[in-house]
């Protein structure tokens, strides 16, 4: 998002210095609360939000089940029934990721514990492994590639999702340039 939004921001506010700091959501929260970080962009559920922080929702994003197309055919998996994948390997995001709480809940609701091949912080790695017919995965819709015929995507029951938000400390003054950056980020996700 940042690399797409920043050039537009720089054209509007050329004299404003932005210091991007890449941190996990869990690391951003204390930095926002302490004032070390003015503005954060993150993905989380409402239950993961912390008091003392304002969250402006930029977009909501649904999770999808991603399965190698060859496996979909072999299992005659027309409706994306997650239970059919009980014995299949999954690559999941690391337990410290905000998405992992959602993913664990999806498996709990499906009535089984997944066979975890490995965990990663990189969703592109999950997509690569699925593309190579090594595993299945649950990902944000952002990572769907309808052009990739090696992967079939399914919506999940209850349509689990998270929010993409701009976050800042309650009572913290949001400057006009910061507001511009938030608006540009919101536009990015609604295009």
Where are the regions a protein language model picked out?
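Alpha-to-beta junction loops
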Residues: 33-42, 63, 112, 130-137
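Flexible hinge/capping segments at coil-to-helix
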Residues: 52-90
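Thr-Gly-centered strand-to-loop micro-motif
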Residues: 93-94, 114, 139-140
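Short hydrophobic/charged patches on amphipathic alpha-helices used for structural packing
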Residues: 29, 33, 55, 82, ...
